[in-house]
Amino acid sequence: MNESRWTEWRILNMSSGIVNVSERHSCPLGFGHYSVVDVCIFETVVIVLLTFLIIAGNLTVIFVFHCAPLLHHYTTSYFIQTMAYADLFVGVSCLVPTLSLLHYSTGVHESLTCQVFGYIISVLKSVSMACLACISVDRYLAITKPLSYNQLVTPCRLRICIILIWIYSCLIFLPSFFGWGKPGYHGDIFEWCATSWLTSAYFTGFIVCLLYAPAAFVVCFTYFHIFKICRQHTKEINDRRARFPSHEVDSSRETGHSPDRRYAMVLFRITSVFYMLWLPYIIYFLLESSRVLDNPTLSFLTTWLAISNSFCNCVIYSLSNSVFRLGLRRLSETMCTSCMCVKDQEAQEPKPRKRANSCSI
């Protein structure tokens, strides 16, 4: 009798151990079951790399704006700074799934951690996407209404717009705490998020109709019309050159492309990157919530592809701004100059005499 009870107890322990191991080794890309290290290595490397790039890139943008007061005179800088702060917090928040993949306990119930993390990331990405749309509207007004632009876009209105963006982003994902469904797949690193917190077709449609679709439409509409205006300006310039040929015009044509064409190329890159990173996520979000497709690998890849937009934002929107590039160059020169001054001071200070066999540069 005792032996039979002991056998049953061992079987139960072994089965529970197998379940725990499978739960512990479940990795989003399906490369779990590591026999040597109990870590989702590939997923951890991807998230850590993205976290480092997002934090480093957006910290650079924030630091340049802080040290270059000239940038504050441009209305676009309000949205770029807001986007940089939101994307920076996205990078910091990405440390949470990294710790989960490394199997560090958060000290909080997994369901609560999953819900809070998913909500925060969704809000931050919403702020970032709304800022992208506002930047496109700002550039559209600057080109289509240059005379009344200063009256339409004032610092006070910009601050109100940024506050409304944060409030709207916080409210639109709030129903996820009241059983409406999962707001995204950012928390699917957690086991509870992936298996117990399901998406809802109605809530997904609600988010897409009130956030993703309007932002994508605004970006596409404004940049398409800006691109169209740039082409029209280029055509008018070429017509004037044909009517009034001169040596200066010919030489300027040979030296490089017109500013309108360069600006159009910047807009093309911005729009292309935006849709390449966000469109796969939105499509999968709709298909999975409609129970048409369910693939953890696609969920992981599309989610972190969209999150990588937080790094691409600071690269494209900042480096495409000539004033920002100037501020970054001056900041780099200042830092290099200060380093050289420190080295010169150290060189001028008397140093103890070195022995003959010591190394000196």
Swiss-Prot record:
Annotated CDD domains: 7tm_classA_rhodopsin-like (cd00637)
Glycosylation sites: 2, 13, 20
Entry keywords, A to Z: Cell membrane, Disulfide bond, G-protein coupled receptor, Glycoprotein, Membrane, Receptor, Transducer, Transmembrane, Transmembrane helix
Tissue and organ expression note: Expressed in brain, especially in striatum.
Any GO MF annotation of the entry: G protein-coupled receptor activity
Gene3D superfamilies membership: Rhodopsin 7-helix transmembrane proteins (1.20.1070.10)
One cellular component term from this protein's GO annotations in UniProt: plasma membrane
Biological processes annotated in GO: cellular response to light stimulus; G protein-coupled receptor signaling pathway; locomotory behavior; phototransduction; response to xenobiotic stimulus
Domain of life from the UniProt record: Eukaryota
Disulfide bonds, paired cysteine numbers: 114-193
Subcellular location, record wording: Cell membrane
Primary localisation category: membrane
Residues exposed to the Cytoplasmic side: 66-87, 138-159, 225-265, 318-361
Entry similarity comment: Belongs to the G-protein coupled receptor 1 family.
Official protein name in the record: G-protein coupled receptor 52
Protein's organism: Homo sapiens (Human)
Lineage summary: Eukaryota, Metazoa, Chordata, Craniata, Vertebrata
